[in-house]
Amino acid sequence: QRGEHVAIVTPTASGKSLCYTLPVVSAAMQDKAKALYLFPTKALAQDQVAELLELNRAGELGVKAFTFDGDTPGDARQAIRLHGDIVVSNPDMLHQAILPHHTKWAQFFENLRYVVIDEIHAYRGVFGSHVTNVLRRLKRICAFYGVQPQFILCSATIGNPHAHAQALVEERV
């Protein structure tokens, strides 16, 4: 809640997603804040959206969560850009479909408060370097829109989460 970047490391099925979902949903409801969730696979992203939709239905929260990936129909993309409170995607879609077209996402970026990166252990080696560069571009575009989102980085299986998280976002975590 203080806006500091954080790394969350806890075993699988221990409630990691609740650690970030509760403040994200609360901010979306109270302040119209936006969040971008990044997962390394479509399956994980779709699971997260299903959980968010179930939480939303159960609590009648009014928070709109959408998957934005290569399978997202063209006619749905504009609605996601304009009305998504939580956009769930992957680093490649961020790189290829969101950042190059950031002017179409202006309303989203102007209100972006959280960037959640799950399964950070998947981002190492050449792919990890690529993701670091994509995140660098994301931060530059966020600065253009006058925001500095909080990064929340998660993993269940990483030996040195603090150092790895800092290397990914190139900031103190």
Segments and roles (model prediction):
Residues G159-N160:
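Conserved H-loop
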Residues Q1-Y145, P149-C154, A163-L168:
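Conserved P-loop/Walker A NTP-binding site and adjacent catalytic elements of P-loop NTPases
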